[in-house]
């Protein structure tokens, strides 16, 4: 953010127009999270953004995404060959059903639990498949489903709506 400010960027509105936007997508094979600056590497939304993956594949097709456990070319192939659906997942304990219902309602999606367990672990909606993986599940198994993958912020579900809305918007532009 310091570099952006030095180049004249003023932060007025999230996802508003700006002079420059620098995103750190990957750094070797390491994972980094700084909650104070809101920096997360790998970038949490790069796995479903074609405009990020296509140029990345041109320069580093075999580079591994340390969270997804797939190469950049595999991630791009995954979004090119799957249904028009976004899979969401969170490390939180099952998340907030009420929050997800509200988000789906606000986006005009239907919300239905597709699990018989008392606290459903999977929810389906139009273009949304909200998924809370078990701790034992590997990244490979999480990626095995259909649709691009978006990892929801683990600290607070109040921002999920913005993240999901941005993902749906990106999907609709593809």
Regions found by a protein language model. Name each.
Residues 1-5, 9-92, 113-174:
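Flexible, gly/pro- and Lys/Arg-enriched active-site loops
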Residues 85-107:
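Glycine-rich phosphate-binding P-loop
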Residues 110:
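Residue-level detector of anion-binding/catalytic polar loops
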């Amino acid at each position: 953010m310091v570099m952006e400010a030095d180049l004249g960027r003023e932060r007025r509105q999230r996802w508003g127009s700006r002079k420059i936007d620098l995103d750190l997508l990957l750094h070797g094979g390491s994972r980094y999270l700084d909650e104070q600056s809101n920096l997360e590497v790998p970038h949490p939304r790069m796995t479903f953004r074609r405009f990020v993956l296509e140029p990345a594949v041109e320069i580093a097709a075999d580079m591994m995404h340390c969270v997804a456990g797939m190469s950049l070319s595999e991630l791009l192939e995954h979004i090119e060959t799957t249904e028009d659906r976004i899979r969401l997942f969170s490390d939180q304990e099952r998340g907030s059903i009420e929050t997800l219902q509200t988000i789906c309602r606000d986006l005009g999606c239907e919300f239905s639990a597709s699990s018989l367990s008392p606290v459903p672990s999977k929810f389906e909606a139009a273009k949304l498949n909200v998924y809370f993986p078990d701790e034992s599940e590997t990244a490979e198994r999480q990626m095995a489903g259909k649709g691009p993958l978006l990892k929801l912020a683990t600290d607070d579900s109040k921002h999920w709506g913005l993240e999901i809305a941005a993902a749906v918007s990106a999907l609709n532009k593809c």
